[in-house]
């Protein structure tokens, strides 16, 4: 008589050690799981709710300045080191891991208008209202030695901004004109100007390092090529641009922070139309900085808040504010893409998480797997109304909330007026202008 025995491979169900998880046999046939999508929807909903529960972005406040913080700079080689300049001429160097000030320098008389680090991280440069450019060592002086700058350049006009070349011993300053300096000389290598108004900010391109951009008080954004020693082109907007920031991953993309509450992302090869208009702030945007990934940027505003925008979206994904934070003057995204720093005029530097609900520290493999799974579920169901409402909800200060409502009413009134004008005019006599093109006045080459 023949008897057929069931045989199973123990490797498929036996644990190697008692610490391993029990192996559960699964059949992935969809006919056996008719409620798979409803289950995933509930999981996505719970993951979205938990994300809002654990959204606690504020980490630390670095206090010590005796006047408003006017500018920030990152160390190019060290994640933990940050430099800040204040309105009383004081420069402080901070250690983010210990969250304390490790060095204080009385650098200028009056405002510190700009601060930047050398590409190798051995020194940094400051400019101030006292018409000087000073170079300082990154390491402090020895015991008993006085704090002295390495070099001091006496200028003829007030400098309003400074930025260092990403690869060479060259830096640029701006004021009445854009000056390109060699570190070994006391006179500028070349000076470039276009128009007569003062220039508030200058920034080198991190990829095409010979390109730089500046923004002036006459509403211009001017692009320069160091190799030509002449301006390339400029775009004139409706209102003044406070500063610009280049995308660290896409060579010809930059974002401008404007006085009309918006940010404009441009492609320098087609300046007549912005790539994207970013709208959410309710007051002038004062500073902008990209994340190292080039996918997002953070903006600082006069409305006492900072916002994080995806590059390809017109609305912000996150808004940060505190009860004590006043007008935010400067903002930086750290080089590891995990943290954001902002300096405001009530003398504090605040440290935030880039992802509000992110768990800090080392994650176990199961935590990583659960996090990735929840993230995929949230992306899959992100457009469902209930999940979308929970994910978008933010608590805002009453001042910002009321201003948002007011701006919404004004925008709707303008739209209604424009529709009525088109309706009661001869067909084709009133041009329809898109939101992107409304704010660009002209492009001059």
Swiss-Prot record:
It is found in: Nucleus, Nucleolus. GO terms for biological process: decidualization; maturation of SSU-rRNA from tricistronic rRNA transcript (SSU-rRNA, 5.8S rRNA, LSU-rRNA); oocyte growth; protein ubiquitination; rRNA processing. Coiled coil: none annotated. One of its GO terms (molecular function) is ubiquitin-like ligase-substrate adaptor activity. It holds the Pfam family WD40. Gene3D superfamilies: YVTN repeat-like/Quinoprotein amine dehydrogenase. It comes from the Eukaryota. InterPro entries: Sof1, WD40/YVTN_repeat-like_dom_sf, WD40_repeat_CS, WD40_repeat_dom_sf, WD40_rpt, WD_repeat_DCAF13/WDSOF1. The modification N6-acetyllysine is found at residue 49. WD repeats lie at residues 64-104, 107-146, 149-191, 194-234, 236-276, 280-319, 323-362. PROSITE patterns: WD_REPEATS_1 (PS00678), WD_REPEATS_2 (PS50082), WD_REPEATS_REGION (PS50294). One of its GO terms (cellular component) is nucleolus. The keyword Ribonucleoprotein applies. Keywords: Acetylation, Nucleus, Repeat, Ribonucleoprotein, Ribosome biogenesis, rRNA processing, Ubl conjugation pathway, WD repeat. Pathway: Protein modification; protein ubiquitination. Residues 353-441 are annotated as: Required for nucleolar location. Its main location: nucleus. PANTHER family: DDB1- AND CUL4-ASSOCIATED FACTOR 13, U3 SMALL NUCLEOLAR RNA U3 SNORNA ASSOCIATED PROTEIN. Part of the small subunit (SSU) processome, first precursor of the small eukaryotic ribosomal subunit. During the assembly of the SSU processome in the nucleolus, many ribosome biogenesis factors, an RNA chaperone and ribosomal proteins associate with the nascent pre-rRNA and work in concert to generate RNA folding, modifications, rearrangements and cleavage as well as targeted degradation of pre-ribosomal RNA by the RNA exosome. Participates in the 18S rRNA processing in growing oocytes, being essential for oocyte nonsurrounded nucleolus (NSN) to surrounded nucleolus (SN) transition. Part of the small subunit (SSU) processome, composed of more than 70 proteins and the RNA chaperone small nucleolar RNA (snoRNA) U3. Component of the DCX(DCAF13) E3 ubiquitin ligase complex, at least composed of CUL4 (CUL4A or CUL4B), DDB1, DCAF13 and RBX1. Interacts (via WD40 domain) with DDB1. Interacts with ESR1 and LATS1. Belongs to the WD repeat DCAF13/WDSOF1 family. This is DDB1- and CUL4-associated factor 13. It comes from Pongo abelii. The gene is DCAF13.
